[in-house]
């Protein structure tokens, strides 16, 4: 068979396959009827009603779950949703029965509708769900139902009645302090909250255009609306604090019907973070104090220390929490590091504070500082020329001064700079002088180097000078006696030397004569 013959054979086989596939699809469509068409909007609305039900009035109030109490009654004109079985279609009196076919024959499996689909005898029509009744209008509208404001700031939330049913109604404003958001990511303060959860408290009642009740204990915290205009009901808080944050509920009672409107109010304040590095002595370690002051809400801060950018273990820090009378919390963290050497450079100490304003909002604050390291001064006290002298070596210039402490009180003194410290550039040497006391007996002279920052200790040196009359009459007498004693000692030495010389002269001739006699034959 040539190439042309093979091409005709392939085309014939392909055409036969297409015809077979189309025939199979047609048979399958005839055996499986399509689902019934969806009902038109007119049928859905009519089938949703119940027998004898009346449509809702246009001005009926909306009784939604958030605006009505659980015990609130349903308005008379509101239709109830019909009870629809899961397997049976809804039966209503408002939908007419289906008309018989035009040819008078009952519908069967072989009878098709106008669009070609079976009109009966096939699959049963699934039940159509009934339409929910229309919602009532809300009786009260507020511009915001969840409000968050800064701490101690005034708050105003505009609310107003949306319907006309205000005459003769009793309006009440309730307040409840509740346990607000507490982040589990923050550190526990372990202190008592002065404003814990409390039961609801009635703040204000208005009826028939006059004030029926006003809380004497809490009323000064609010500005209540005027009873002459029951349609305008704003919520005004003079200062939003831990004592006034919570849930506020407007409630309207009209006979057996009770409606409510809830507004949730919360407050917050970010901490004021500061770091104060503590002065240190060479080789004594480092310390710093971090403060996160006056923050709210509780358990909303987390604190970490860093040394030269690296985290510091929590065991090196000690935290203390406090709460004031207004409900604001504060924390103080003291960091102590002992691994220091005399020649080490002071580190950079950083305090990071994470503050959780709400469940989904986190802000971070940090402060850092470097401790100042001081060298202990070298102090020495001695007495010279009727004066007490104090020498202080290697002290900060312009900051440190010398103070004398003596039993007889204050006496004239002077302090002067004698040079620079050779061992530590930038430090100087001081010399303080004070007259000796006129008090008889032993007297202690204490010299103190003042001006070092807290919490460094005071550096001092003490020496005792005995001015008893039995020993010396005065400082001048001491000098005279010393000179006399010296001269007396010199005189004694001269006398002794003269005596020895004379004795040597007397003995010398006798020895010469004896030697001469001994040498004669």
From Swiss-Prot:
Residues 497-521 are cytoplasmic. Glycans are attached at residues 111, 164, 208. It is found in: Virion membrane. Its main location: virion. Residues 1-21 form the signal peptide. Residues 41-54 have a biased composition (Low complexity). Residues 24-138 are annotated as: Disordered. Belongs to the herpesviridae glycoprotein C family. Essential for the initial attachment to heparan sulfate moieties of the host cell surface proteoglycans. Plays also a role in host immune evasion by inhibiting the host complement cascade activation. This is Envelope glycoprotein C homolog.
């Amino acid at each position: 068979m040539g190439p042309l013959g093979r091409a005709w054979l392939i085309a014939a086989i392909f055409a036969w396959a297409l015809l077979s596939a189309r025939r199979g699809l047609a048979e399958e469509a005839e055996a499986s009827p399509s689902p019934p068409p969806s009902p038109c909007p007119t049928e859905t609305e009519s089938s949703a009603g119940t027998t004898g039900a009346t449509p809702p009035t246009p001005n009926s109030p909306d009784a939604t779950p958030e605006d009505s109490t659980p015990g609130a009654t349903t308005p008379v004109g509101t239709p109830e949703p019909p009870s629809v079985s899961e397997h049976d279609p809804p039966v209503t009196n408002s939908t007419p029965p289906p008309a018989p076919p035009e040819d008078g024959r009952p519908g069967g499996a072989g009878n098709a509708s106008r669009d070609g689909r079976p009109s009966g005898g096939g699959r049963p029509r699934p039940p159509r769900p009934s339409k929910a009744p229309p919602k009532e209008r809300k009786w009260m509208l507020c511009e915001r139902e969840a409000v968050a404001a800064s701490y101690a700031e005034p708050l105003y939330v505009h609310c107003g009645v949306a319907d006309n049913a205000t005459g003769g109604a009793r309006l009440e404003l309730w307040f409840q302090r509740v346990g607000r958001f507490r982040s589990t990511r923050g550190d526990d303060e372990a202190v008592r909250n002065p404003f814990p959860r409390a039961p609801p408290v009635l703040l204000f009642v208005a009826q028939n255009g006059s004030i029926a009740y006003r809380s004497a204990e809490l009323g000064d915290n609010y500005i209540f609306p005027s009873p002459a205009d029951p349609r305008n009901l704003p919520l005004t808080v003079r200062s939003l604090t831990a004592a006034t944050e919570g849930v506020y509920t407007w409630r309207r009672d009209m006979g057996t019907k009770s409606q409510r409107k809830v507004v949730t109010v919360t407050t917050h304040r970010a901490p004021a973070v500061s770091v104060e590095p503590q002065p240190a002595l060479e080789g004594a370690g480092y310390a710093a104090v971090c403060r996160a002051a006056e923050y709210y809400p509780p358990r909303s801060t987390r604190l970490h220390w860093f040394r030269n950018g690296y985290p510091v273990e929590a065991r090196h820090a000690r935290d203390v929490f406090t709460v004031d009378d207004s409900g604001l919390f504060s924390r103080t963290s003291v960091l102590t590091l002992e691994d220091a050497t005399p020649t080490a450079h002071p580190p950079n100490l950083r305090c990071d504070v994470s503050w959780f304003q709400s469940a989904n909002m986190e802000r971070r604050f940090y402060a850092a500082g470097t401790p100042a390291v001081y060298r202990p001064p070298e102090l020495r006290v001695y007495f010279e020329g009727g004066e007490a002298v104090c020498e202080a070596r290697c002290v900060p210039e312009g900051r440190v001064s010398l103070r004398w402490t003596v039993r007889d009180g204050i006496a004239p003194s002077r302090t002067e700079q004698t040079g620079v410290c050779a061992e530590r550039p930038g430090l100087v040497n001081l010399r303080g002088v004070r007259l000796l006391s006129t008090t008889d007996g032993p007297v202690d002279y204490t010299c103190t180097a003042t001006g070092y920052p807290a919490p460094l200790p005071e550096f001092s040196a003490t020496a005792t000078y005995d001015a008893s009359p039995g020993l010396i009459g005065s400082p001048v007498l001491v000098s005279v006696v010393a000179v006399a004693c010296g001269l007396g000692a010199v005189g004694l030495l001269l006398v002794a030397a003269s005596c020895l010389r004379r004795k040597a002269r007397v003995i010398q001739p006798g020895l010469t004569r004896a030697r001469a006699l001994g040498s004669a034959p």
